[in-house]
Amino acid sequence: MCIRDRDYVSGNRKLGLLWLAGGIDWSQSLLEGRKWNLLSQPDYLITAGDSLGEPQRIEKYRIYGQAAYVLSPKIKVGIDGDYTATSNEDRSSYHIYHGMAHLIRISGGIVYEQVRRRFGASIHYTHRTEELTYDTDSKDKLYTFPLGYWLPMQELSGSFLFRSQGKRLGVSLQTETLKEHWSLFHDLFYETQQLADNPNNSGNLRGWEERLHQISYQGRFTRTNKSWTHIWSPTARFNQTTANRILQRNPTTSSSAIWTTFATYRLARQRMLSTQLSYEATKNDTSGEKVSTWQMTVGWNRLENDFYIYPFTVKQYTGLFHGEIAFFRQIRLPKENKLSIRPSVYIVSGYGTEIKWEKETQKDENGSAEIKLEQNMQKVNEDFIARTATRLGIGTEMEYRHPIHSALSAGFRLKGSLEQTTSPQSTLGGGGNFSIVIWL
């Protein structure tokens, strides 16, 4: 179960050929009993505490800005960036962990427009630092998630402070063709990423580093027919990631002595191919004083993993189906007030299979490494692992907007959801969100 609060202030201003925008965003989530499963996996070091399923508080602050400039009737350039600080802490009486992350992102791009075509190019850079403190006296195991496997952080014996640093650089090329009743969009993307996790005072297991290369293609074909809009979106993504375990020793008993690396082991190597196809249909009705829209979305994603995770060679196949039916209604009230309502029903269902072969322990002249792996899937037999999960839910969103001035309006948003999840045990949960919003 979760309770979320969110507020933000944003605005924009046009100065001749220059357009500026920016804002401040704050959110807080109070979560109860959330744990990882096949459909929800941790993203960063500070989410490692989610493996405990303890009550937690997640707080996020974000400052962002954007700028665009018209160089000529056909050429536009732009730049945007943001800073985000995220806190994740255990709200139980034990206070086992607390994590903090700082993220800085900056990107820029250029767009060239013709009568029926657009061409674009962009580049982005992201820098992220994290810190997680953990009570090592706790009997509960805390996990982290390198390359798709959960490793117990107790293997880094004696550690109480973990740090990570990540850098990401990507480039993208886009083309778009616009016709009277249809449009076609292509996006080709490449990204490289480096991530290092380094615990302090951890004996001879000092951490690991990961390097990722990703190339992806995304297409979108849109066709309109009277009040109907149909969108087909194929996507393909290929990732290659390597992760190394770095072994170090402290030659003296002094805590300030320099650690020396005496071995580096290939902890993991992964090649991942993801293919996805989704379809969306909407029907709009703007007659009278009401605006109504029916929305239907279905999609299928298949993921193939071929990776070596010490000391196993693993082949993993995962499939995920999602669907949603929603109805959107906007009602114009007296004095230019507006009320919007969006009820929906959705389903997410996934399965996973895994085949594993064990290899010999890696050794070198100076030492050997033994790393225990704990997996989230139900073991069927010695070489085969399978898991299925299904999430069925209903939700609703409501927004009220009241004009205060020609350039200012205020209102609120209200969201709620109820979910039934089987993975393989059946659980029932829900959450709500209330926000006060100012529009400029």
Please describe what each predicted stretch is:
Residues L17-G22, P73-G81, R117-I123, W182-L188, ...:
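Transmembrane beta-strands of outer-membrane beta-barrel proteins
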Residues M1-D5:
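Conserved small/polar residues in nucleotide/adenosyl-binding loops
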Residues W26-L30, Y83-S87, Y125-T129, Y190-Q194, ...:
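Transmembrane beta-strands of outer-membrane beta-barrel pores
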